[in-house]
Amino acid sequence: MDESALTLGTIDVSYLPNSSEYSIGRCKHATEEWGECGSRPTVFRSATLKWKESLMSRKRPFVGRCCYSCTPQSWDKFFNPSIPSLGLRNVIYINETHTRHRGWLARRLSYVLFIQERDVHKGMFATNVTENVLNSSRVQEAIAEVAGELNPDGSAQQQSKAVNKVKKKARKILQEMVATVSPAMIRLTGWVLLKLFNSFFWNIQIHKGQLEMVKAATETNLPLIFLPVHRSHIDYLLLTFILFCHNIKAPYIASGNNLNIPIFSTLIHKLGGFFIRRRLDETPDGRKDILYRALLHGHIVELLRQQQFLEIFLEGTRSRSGKISCARAGLLSVVVDTLSTNTIPDILIIPGGISYDRIIEGHYNGEQLGKPKKNESLWSIARGVIRMLRKNYGCVKTDFAQPFSLKEYLESQSQKPVSAPLSLEQALLPAILPSRPSGAADEGTDMSINESRNATDESRRRLIAHLAEHILFTASKSCAIMSTHIVACLLLYRHRQGIGLFTLVEDFFVMKEEVLARDFDLGFSGNSEDVVMHAIQFLGNCITITHTSKNDEFFITPSTTIPSVFELNFYSNGVLHVFIMEAIIACSLYAVLKKRGPGGPASPSLVSQEQLVHKAASLCYLLSNEGTISLPCQTFYQICHETVGRFIQYGILIVAEQDDQEDISPGLAEQQWDKKLPEPLSWRSDEEDEDSDFGEEQRDCYLKVSQSKEHQQFITFLQRLLGPLLEAYSSAAVFIHNFGGPVPEPEFLQKLHKYLITRTERRVAVYAESATYCLVKNAVKTFKDIGVFKETKQKRVSGLELSNTFLPQCNRQKLLEYILSLVVL
């Protein structure tokens, strides 16, 4: 294989928009030329042939622009039309041209000279943090409160002793928390990482235009918050290394205290890392630790006050599924509070995407099979480094989204009408149990709790949750799609029974173009044959390659063992967010058609657009714990409506002729459709209803499904993408038919996971990857949100029992039927 196509020691022209060199290079390769490929059957080609540009004029999208609706001023800030054309740079490709020196010695010492010339010094970083935090008013109040609890009725002398005792405890906590950045250690680590990264990565690509935006943001003298996705332990070092190489101040990195281990913790502290508890409520009695919360809040405020940069992983932990997890916005709330108190004028938010051909951990099969997570230790880190040095992990693509003003975002949200979003229970129960009286609620559910909550606190919580969703959605849009993601996805959901190498290369090429057409970037370049072989090299443990003497071709088959399928699914999930909305429409289309069936209208191939959008929106709610599906400033109904419009544009759905629509009289179920769902679920606005010149029956239109082979294959592919998720949810619904309750939640998760694994081992499951532990946890969380389970707290363990609504067996059966209506097996 031609390594030059992938190592990218210099800028690869295939990354540059409208590159004539790129066009010529592609024309030389007959199998890559669009004109020749157009006559061959592939999974997506016909679905997008109407609107696809030719390969020669295809532009790489510039990803990561901020939300124009919520931050219109930031949209034009730090960005100019020349930014996207700046191209990519391989960060770990360093030679004498990157230094001020030339000659033989400069070539031999280029790494040392490059590191020495980086701008990093002590004055860049925070000083006197511990004392400033201890003397802050909030921490002083917390110390006095905790001391009062320790000595409620003591004398003044005893009270003074209690205060001193609490102060010592606070100082000890801060010693573990506060980082003491060492410029010398940053330089040394930069040199070591440059050597290490060159040994086990082929390249680390960044977009030079994105770095220009970050540099422009640093010149505002405002604190920056970097919020990247979390894929691997290497993430902690990767961002600091990239910023260091471009003379940008290293951020203070929030890290879980599971990494607070001897020697390694000292290194992390010297590089700007600070350790925080994974759970803030770690007092023996499970109460809020007032002192720790005050110290953490004071520490963040002090860093921001001194205009330091922060790096926070909103997901809280590495993604074990390959998908971006839901946000945990604890530290983000501290940042918002700091700005709300006018301590600093503004904060700039920078979401980030990180994509790997192969993560250094390789996979998370142990945890996905239900094995307990191993605690990190110095020995495990040493073994990991040794293992890394013996392998190659391919390419890395890091993206920095456009910085946006947190102050502007908060002000724009305050000007929007505040309305509480629908809970999953409010959104889905009317569809699952249509005969249930509206407004019915169980005793002991969250209804009474919500009513008693302070409205201001609830509004603040929603504001922070929406901000976190905004950031994660932008970060996911910024994540490049790697070659391993596409190959794993094709093998699992297009060619699960195996495929010839030549056909796999064709489908890879077309799927790559589909990714670009949806405004997602790629983390690779080169001709498709080389890139596919590159991906197969990293997925080798999960696939079987055989040589067929008949056609003299290699045949690629995904392995059927559970660990192999889990690993392929991990990498395949890297491309799921590209097609998630289209997959939701495809599954909803199946559900609507199946429901109408033989007893429906005269033309069962016609689908009500209104009905399809409602069904898709309810599926969005059902899958909302699988990650951020849309921006919070958009409703599910808006994006479902837009996606249906794209299906019409693709030609997959065809608007029926007026004569065909007039022949159809809506059935009773269709007439009552809106009555089964809460009023806010309409994707049309009140203004549209008032201004429309047409009746309700004329605003809805009917759609026909294209019967072409290519379109049907595309729909099937999309339905398979959600197959593992829906099979896991439906299997969980089957499992609760015999729920004995009450039961501790960890025990229930373990039993449900064992049930799913057993289904897979007995080959009952259609998708073996439906048995991953992540899907088990997400299914149970969704059932809690819907109101299937009531959650009880005993000491520090959560317990589960069926709610009053789902105690009747018939209602659990309706839940199962609702999920099964969406499942395509």
Curated annotation (Swiss-Prot):
CDD domains registered for this protein in UniProt: LPLAT_DHAPAT-like (cd07993)
Keywords: Acetylation, Acyltransferase, Lipid biosynthesis, Lipid metabolism, Membrane, Mitochondrion, Mitochondrion outer membrane, Phospholipid biosynthesis, Phospholipid metabolism, Phosphoprotein, Transferase
Intramembrane residue stretches from the record: 88-118
Subcellular location: Mitochondrion outer membrane
Superkingdom of this protein's organism: Eukaryota
Tissue expr: Highly expressed in adipose tissues and lung. Low expression in liver.
Name under which the protein is recorded: Glycerol-3-phosphate acyltransferase 1, mitochondrial
Native organism taxonomy: Eukaryota, Metazoa, Chordata, Craniata, Vertebrata
